[in-house]
Each structure stands twice: as structure tokens, then as C-alpha cells.
Amino acid sequence: MAKKFDKDSFSGTLIVVLAVSLICSVIVAGAVVGLKPIQEKQKLQDKQGYILSVAGLMDKDTDIGKTFAERIEQRVVDLATGEYVADAPKDFSARIAGKDPAQSIRIKTEDDLAGIKSRAKYTEVYLVKGEDGKIGQIILPMHGNGLWSVMYGFVAIQPDGNTINGITYYEQGETPGLGGEIGNPLWQQKFVGKKLFDGQGKLALHVGKGAGSDKEHGVDALSGASLTSKGVQGSFAYWFGENGYIPYLNKLKSAGAQ
């Protein structure tokens, strides 16, 4: 005669616990798989929102997907040549490519002003079209190390390749109230109208204590956050240097954003 299952025994309790754990793990795994498309869609919308924001095209009533499709053209640039990559996939991500040795380069220590060690060979850029369909701004991704985190942002510049229209940081883990103020629109506003380069084409934008007195190129560092501010300076120094966007910006100046 088969022994009756005793759920109150040690073995019975163990079986019940294992069964419940298995069922719960299946439910959780299913939820993760089911929610992933929703999470990816939200992530894309958030990114598009930041791009529209730095372009000055975002308010509380903005239809993000519609406005992005109408006003933003995403292109992929070969950073070594400054040329557009004609056959780049629509879903290309420099952030993902940067983790693939075949799609990225190691940065020499002496050149690594942003402290990022490596970067993708290609990157996305975003051309902002005006009401007349002409390119009025170019939005360039930028990232670099701060005190505690890698700081990811966008810089909007005019077609002259020199004048800043805006910046935003959309992902960072700096100290709240100190370095975290890189996400404060009031501080970001200080970059608007600044020139990246001097008359000889050398990077002149600088972020530091008292730098705001230089009305053309300077931005005051964040109070109490000298290392984060130094990280912002390093990010600009790398990405707007010869190993970053200079080849692309030179193409813009000679041939136009189109």
C-alpha cells in the first residue's frame, strides 16, 4: 500500500517549498520575458525625449515618437574619417558596440582624457530639422568618467560645428546635490551660446572654478564637485578632440550638415 503523502513531515515540507519555488521562478521568468519589449520601448522613448529636450523641442504636450520621427534624423558616423556609414543598421548602438572588441578600439592612456578606456568605432549622431526641413542643429552623444560614475549626455551644436545650443546629462551616478547637479537645467544652461573652439580650431571650452568669467568659452565648475566638473571637462576634451568628433565636425564645416 502506497504511503500517504504527509505535507507536515520534513520531506513533505521540503517538497512543498521546492514546488512553490519552482512555480514562482517560472512566473517571474515569464514576467521578465513578457515585460522586456515594454521596457525596451520605454527606454527608447526616454532616450528620444532627452534628444528632443536638448534640441529645445520638448514640452509637456510633446508627442515624443511623432516629433522625433518628423524632426530628428539619426545617422551613424565613422569617428576615424568623419564620414556617414551608409550601411549601418537602424538599431545601431555605440554603447553596445563599445563592448564588442571587433566594433571598438582601445584608447591609449595618454589620449584617454574622458577616462573611458575604449569606445565604439562608430557612433550615432542626430540631425535636427527645422520647419523648413533644413538641418538646424546636430546632437552628439558624449560620455566620460566623473567621480563615481560614467556620465552619459548629449551636446547640441549649431551647423557651424562650434556653437553650443544645449547640453543634457541623462544618466549618471554622481553625488546628489553636488556632482549630481550636472543634471540641473540651470547649470546646463550655462553652456548655451559658448564656443567649443578658438580661432585656430583648438578646443577652448573649459569648465573650472571661475571659468565663467570667460564669456565666450568658460563655464563655472559645480560648487563642491571639482572632480565631477573635471570629468565634464575631460569628456569635452576627448570627444571634441582629434580622436572624437573633430573629423566629423571638419566635414560639416566644409560640406554642410547635409
UniProtKB/Swiss-Prot annotation:
It is an enzyme of class 7 (translocase). Keywords: Cell inner membrane, Cell membrane, Flavoprotein, FMN, Ion transport, Membrane, NAD, Phosphoprotein, Sodium, Sodium transport, Translocase, Transmembrane, Transmembrane helix, Transport, Ubiquinone. Its cofactor is FMN. GO terms for biological process: sodium ion transport. The modification FMN phosphoryl serine is found at residue 226. It is found in: Cell inner membrane. The chain crosses the membrane at residues 14-34. The keyword Transport applies. GO terms for cellular component: plasma membrane. Its main location: membrane. Its EC number is 7.2.1.1. GO terms for molecular function: FMN binding; oxidoreductase activity, acting on NAD(P)H, quinone or similar compound as acceptor. InterPro entries: FMN-bd, NqrC. Pfam families: FMN_bind. It comes from the Bacteria. It is a single-pass membrane protein. It catalyses: a ubiquinone + n Na(+)(in) + NADH + H(+) = a ubiquinol + n Na(+)(out) + NAD(+). Belongs to the NqrC family. NQR complex catalyzes the reduction of ubiquinone-1 to ubiquinol by two successive reactions, coupled with the transport of Na(+) ions from the cytoplasm to the periplasm. NqrA to NqrE are probably involved in the second step, the conversion of ubisemiquinone to ubiquinol. Composed of six subunits; NqrA, NqrB, NqrC, NqrD, NqrE and NqrF. This is Na(+)-translocating NADH-quinone reductase subunit C. It comes from Neisseria meningitidis serogroup B (strain ATCC BAA-335 / MC58).
